[in-house]
């Protein structure tokens, strides 16, 4: 309309508006902004994770910026290598994409902007290391970062070291990897990509390569029986899938009341790892300690999952798809010319359902396939009820309707779970994937990892499924042999010992306590009172309790020995608000309950049973 230049994100459209998006003035302004960004950016592109994929690099090339007219002002390099997600603030251009992905898409808010002006940074909560925050390691911040300021820990060297040390290296490949790896090698719709991956890994030094889709069949089979048992007993419903480690950590942190509802069946990665180390090692006569199991996944959170104490080293190394690309390219081989090889038996056969685990709806669909093999199903109907959320209604012959929900994206998940809690939505079984479109959109997938690319990967995976002769996990005879030889029956004691686990609520932030009213007196005289200020307790009144405790300490003589602290989680979210008095947790705390317990502690310390009870 001939007005000044305005930002598109702040200008509301109106009827008849005329907009010019590319004029000489706008071109020069964009060019100047790029030059300023380059002047404050780490220009060591050759060793950057994003070299060749960097948006800043691409825009500089598109605008013909071969030199920069501004002097480089280096930012303070703040590198966090503490966890699976590696942070390098020297590469950050403060675009905010990672912050928005974490806050708006995933509703985790593990990172945000801090400080002002040139000192502005993107940092984790309380400037903690990422591993000590509520981060669920979904990797969507990495997927959306345009410059490599956020990257994934590289574990490729561990693989080469294992091969060099003569270890019996076994690989296993997730379904979603075969749908995305071809993007890096100029291949389209190559249904032989899985076989090419097997061939290259064997050339590198892998002894065996298995298909995680096999264990997806196993997990679907076991999980379907677990669901039918819960349905019959009408307990722990709705049953939530537990294949996605980002979702599991999200549930442990934000919805601890639903942790018992998580399926106890391990994820396909961890189930196959346990089977290989426990049974297959004996079959091939190799000490399990000499086996190095390398899992190749589309997901950053799978690295976190493999390191969880519950799984006790079932999987040794996890490589993302991007790391596998580095391995393949470093060999110098033309993957298009590599002859494909089949996955090794006995864990190389899978059904269409097992392959479908790589995309949203796949786990639920596989469970439904098994249910249909076990009980009479009259009709199955699926419809979208909101963005990222599908409802499947399974009508059984006896007239019962089983409702299943498949939801992706933790922001959508939060809405669904909140509606389940309020009763606005009903379901019997819920499939959850932390990343949009499921595993094909995982944080470890190649760049670009946008909506269009994810949709194409889903299409490739469907084409790959279509050539599989087996439809249901029940048809996988190698899986049935595994039950006959080792596991016995679904949900047997042996099955529970091997492919089941348990989860627990966890702290969102690993932070030291904050002194509110510290006391200079000896520990023997103190009563330590720590008030949880985590989200669950905070929303249920813990801050008000803290204020009352401070007033109590100032006004009542007996309370002078209360040393008051703030803490972030007592891992008892289901009974919030929580207060820790010495070593005793007071759940559903009120100021009256706290006074009663504190006076009891004082009597025990002083041996004075005559402490006045009038203060109660």
Regions found by a protein language model. Give the residues of each.
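Iron-sulfur-associated redox domains of electron-transfer enzymes in respiratory
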Residues: 1-30, 38, 153-616
